UniProtKB/Swiss-Prot annotation:
<dbReference type="GO" id="GO:0042823">
    <property type="term" value="P:pyridoxal phosphate biosynthetic process"/>
</dbReference>
<comment type="similarity">
    <text>Belongs to the PdxS/SNZ family.</text>
</comment>
<dbReference type="InterPro" id="IPR001852">
    <property type="entry name" value="PdxS/SNZ"/>
</dbReference>
<feature type="binding site">
    <location>
        <position position="42"/>
    </location>
    <ligand>
        <name>D-ribose 5-phosphate</name>
    </ligand>
</feature>
<keyword id="KW-0704">Schiff base</keyword>
<dbReference type="GO" id="GO:0036381">
    <property type="term" value="F:pyridoxal 5'-phosphate synthase (glutamine hydrolysing) activity"/>
</dbReference>
<comment type="function">
    <text>Catalyzes the formation of pyridoxal 5'-phosphate from ribose 5-phosphate (RBP), glyceraldehyde 3-phosphate (G3P) and ammonia. The ammonia is provided by PDX2. Can also use ribulose 5-phosphate and dihydroxyacetone phosphate as substrates, resulting from enzyme-catalyzed isomerization of RBP and G3P, respectively. Also plays an indirect role in resistance to singlet oxygen-generating photosensitizers.</text>
</comment>
<keyword id="KW-0456">Lyase</keyword>
<dbReference type="InterPro" id="IPR013785">
    <property type="entry name" value="Aldolase_TIM"/>
</dbReference>
<dbReference type="Pfam" id="PF01680">
    <property type="entry name" value="SOR_SNZ"/>
</dbReference>
<dbReference type="InterPro" id="IPR033755">
    <property type="entry name" value="PdxS/SNZ_N"/>
</dbReference>
<feature type="binding site">
    <location>
        <begin position="253"/>
        <end position="254"/>
    </location>
    <ligand>
        <name>D-ribose 5-phosphate</name>
    </ligand>
</feature>
<dbReference type="InterPro" id="IPR011060">
    <property type="entry name" value="RibuloseP-bd_barrel"/>
</dbReference>
<comment type="pathway">
    <text>Cofactor biosynthesis; pyridoxal 5'-phosphate biosynthesis.</text>
</comment>
<feature type="active site" description="Schiff-base intermediate with D-ribose 5-phosphate">
    <location>
        <position position="99"/>
    </location>
</feature>
<dbReference type="GO" id="GO:0016843">
    <property type="term" value="F:amine-lyase activity"/>
</dbReference>
<feature type="binding site">
    <location>
        <position position="183"/>
    </location>
    <ligand>
        <name>D-glyceraldehyde 3-phosphate</name>
    </ligand>
</feature>
Length: 313
């Protein structure tokens, strides 16, 4: 999916049942596509937002707590204070995203009302509804949603998601789950491309995904919307890896502002995403960054880690 920027993502034009109050789905997908090839950084203060913008971030995610702190502190994680989000919006000129709990349509309505540029319906926050996601077609603002496999990605797109990201395991500094999820999506798409029409119909039922979206994915050879990597990206090498695996861009959360030199690391990760296929540049930007966030070894049986990615499907 990563490219030289000359190709575009075909827009899904299926019957989404858009209401009169919602924005055109193709417009929302186009807005998300404008972020291709970029880095979206989690920030908790206007000062951090300015650091991210100066480093070259294409957007920021306004939060009260980065995922590492959500893990450490526990409790119920909710939408950030609208006042904080407004302060961050005033401090930068790049787009500002904010997270709503899965299924919490009122949090999403509030975020749209205060003018965020994108809403992330996020498993990193505590679930509000363990059976339903937000009907994103009823909103003008573009939505971002996470996935672990192709079926989950296409279900979110049918609900109106204009951008898909891997779920990974946010706040761990460990990229293994993000790699697993993007490889799962890419592997499913490769298998799909070799199927005939009858097999595609059966496959769509098996993965509980809309047939028209499955067929469009087969024809495109990729998701019908942009796909970013998220969850555990902590180094320039991690970011470049996700781009080489085929992602359109990268979310970086705790990995920047839990490191020794956030401004330097932020610039390095932006450069790594831009030059993801050039090992010499990657070696240069990876040098002298100071200490990375300590991170969590997800395979250590002695450590219990709540799996945010498993909170919904």
């Amino acid at each position: 999916m990563a490219s030289d920027g000359t190709d575009v993502v075909a827009l899904y034009g299926g019957a989404n049942g858009l209401s009169h109050k919602s924005g055109s789905f193709s417009v929302k997908v186009g807005l998300a596509q404008m972020l291709r090839g970029g880095v979206i950084m989690d920030v908790v203060t206007p000062e951090q937002a300015r650091i991210a913008e100066e480093a070259g971030a294409c957007a920021v995610m306004a939060l009260e707590r980065v995922p590492a702190d959500i893990r450490a502190q526990g409790g119920v994680a909710r939408m950030s204070d609208p006042g904080l989000i407004r302060d961050i919006k005033r401090s930068v000129t790049i787009p500002v995203m904010a997270k709503a709990r899965i299924g919490h349509l009122v949090e999403a309505q509030i975020l749209e009302a205060i003018g965020v540029d994108y809403v992330d319906e996020s498993e990193v926050l505590t679930l509000a509804d363990d059976a339903h996601h937000i009907n994103k077609n009823n909103f003008r603002v573009p939505f971002v949603c996470g996935c672990r496999d192709l079926g989950e990605a296409l279900r979110r797109i049918r609900e109106g998601a204009a951008m898909i990201r891997t779920k990974g395991e946010a706040g761990t500094g460990n990229v293994v789950e993000a790699v697993r999820h993007v490889r799962s999506v890419m592997g499913d798409i490769r298998a799909l491309r070799s199927m005939d029409d009858d097999e595609v119909f059966s496959y769509a039922k098996r993965i509980a995904a809309p047939y028209d979206l499955v067929m469009q994915t087969k024809q495109l050879g990729r998701l019908p919307v942009v796909q970013f990597a998220a969850g555990g990206v902590a180094t320039p090498a991690d970011a470049a890896l996700m781009m080489q695996l085929g992602c359109d861009g990268v979310f970086v959360g705790s990995g920047i502002f839990k490191s020794g030199d956030p401004a330097l690391r932020a610039r390095a990760i932006v450069q790594a995403v831009t030059h993801y296929s050039d090992p010499k540049i990657l070696a240069e930007v990876s040098s002298g960054l100071g200490e990375a966030m300590v991170g969590i070894n997800l395979s250590d049986p002695k450590i219990h880690v709540e799996r945010f990615a498993a909170r919904s499907d």
